[in-house]
From Swiss-Prot:
SUPFAM superfamilies: Fe-S cluster assembly (FSCA) domain-like, HesB-like domain. Keywords: 4Fe-4S, Iron, Iron-sulfur, Metal-binding. Its cofactor is [4Fe-4S] cluster. This is Fe/S biogenesis protein NfuA. The keyword tRNA processing does not apply. Involved in iron-sulfur cluster biogenesis. Binds a 4Fe-4S cluster, can transfer this cluster to apoproteins, and thereby intervenes in the maturation of Fe/S proteins. Could also act as a scaffold/chaperone for damaged Fe/S proteins. Homodimer. It comes from Colwellia psychrerythraea (strain 34H / ATCC BAA-681) (Vibrio psychroerythus). The lineage of its organism: Bacteria, Pseudomonadati, Pseudomonadota, Gammaproteobacteria, Alteromonadales. One of its GO terms (molecular function) is 4 iron, 4 sulfur cluster binding. Binds 1 [4Fe-4S] cluster per subunit. The cluster is presumably bound at the interface of two monomers. The keyword DNA-binding does not apply. [4Fe-4S] cluster binds at C149, C152. InterPro entries: Fe/S_biogenesis_protein_NfuA, FeS_biogenesis, FSCA_dom_sf, HesB-like_dom_sf, NIF_FeS_clus_asmbl_NifU_C.
Length: 192
């Protein structure tokens, strides 16, 4: 569920040594499954442990995860690095904004997840986004683009050389291609 690097584990052990005995860390997601999702780490004293918490044992401490955050912390990584600029604790939770779907989930859910988790974060750098409209009976994912992608001169490259290639590779035999249903209008909002 959560990977905590050796450096981060040592950091937590040091911090917890200054807390009351039996104190753990808590890893959580506020507003899980939404665009406003944020992850955090806090102290978890013994009296704050809930009956439905999941306890993840590590050498020298445990990480507590509340039941509501569990699915959104799948594949999360915590690391602690030190360089000339100082020290930093990082928590990467790729599924915090969208719960990871099972490999055997319906095709629509798997494609939607891929777009939200892999494609939209890249498009957001250009002020763009895409949504899955439908999957046709003959295996085409129909997408709608918005923001900076609408009217962008590079949309064909994004669709054919980027999204389509990845989807065909990831979902071989299920997805034959991608169709763009957007009525592109060039304007100030367009990235290129």
């Amino acid at each position: 569920m959560i990977t905590i690097s050796e450096n981060a584990q040592q950091h937590f052990i040091k911090l917890l040594s200054q807390q009351a005995e039996g104190t753990h860390i808590r890893v959580f997601v506020v507003n899980p499954g939404t665009a406003k999702a944020e992850c955090g780490v806090s102290y978890c004293p013994p009296d704050a442990v809930e009956a439905d918490d999941i306890q993840l044992p590590f050498e020298g401490f445990s990480a507590m995860v509340d039941a509501d955050s569990k699915g959104f912390l799948e594949d999360a990584e915590i690391d602690f690095t030190t360089d000339q600029m100082g020290s930093q604790l990082t928590l990467k939770a790729p599924n915090a904004k969208l719960r990871k779907v099972a490999d055997d989930a319906p095709l629509f859910e798997r494609v939607h997840y891929f777009l939200q988790a892999e494609v939209n974060p890249q498009l957001a750098g250009h002020g763009g986004e895409c949504t899955l409209v439908e999957i046709t009976d003959d295996g085409y994912a129909v997408l709608q683009f918005g923001g900076g992608c609408n009217g962008c001169a590079q949309i064909d490259v994004t669709v054919k050389d980027g999204i389509e290639k990845q989807l065909i590779e990831l979902m071989a035999g299920e997805i034959k291609g991608v169709k763009d249903a957007t009525e592109h209008e060039r304007g100030d909002h367009s990235y290129y």
